[in-house]
Amino acid sequence: MRYVIVSVVKGPAGNFNNNLRKEVFEKLGAKSSKLPAHFTIKAPFEADDISDLDKVLQDFAQNHKAQDYKIKGYNHFDNRVIYMDVHMSKECKILHDELIEELEKLPYIHFKNHDYKDKVFHVTISSKKIQKIYDELWEYVNNIPCEFDCKFDNVSVFKWEDNTWKLYKEYLFM
């Protein structure tokens, strides 16, 4: 089975991202992820049994408090991805890194630079074959203010089923 571990962005920032992704698809044909607004904790991986992951995440969530982060403005990876820029507080970054340390103890979780501790935290707007419309898309989103106070208050595991990501389980911090 294929899984991905994310933190779903909720509240005004999550709604903003979900609506903006729909808007840029309708106006410019820019496609995005099938996941809700999120930042990635662990990129997709394969596993047959994730009962040990379930226990790790339950224990972690029960013993950690939600932390603040900000989303402010936009950024991009070359002309391939446009995203909302995430600015982690010191406490939020520590929470993330402690979570990574727990996850990497599992035998089927292998991190790469792009999803390890020093990843570029971001909430994707569009990432599917946007090179031809990149300039227009970049100009479009930059005319829309983007600034939100957020909480890293959940870890959500999604499972790939029926050609889409479906929520397997959400773990809420204290």
PLM regions: where:
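Basic, often amphipathic N-terminal segments
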Residues: M1-D68, S89-F148, K166-M174
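Long, low-complexity, Ser/Thr/Gly/Pro-rich intrinsically disordered segments that act as flexible linkers
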Residues: N75-H76
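Short, exposed beta-strand-loop hairpins at the edges of beta-sheets
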Residues: V157-W160
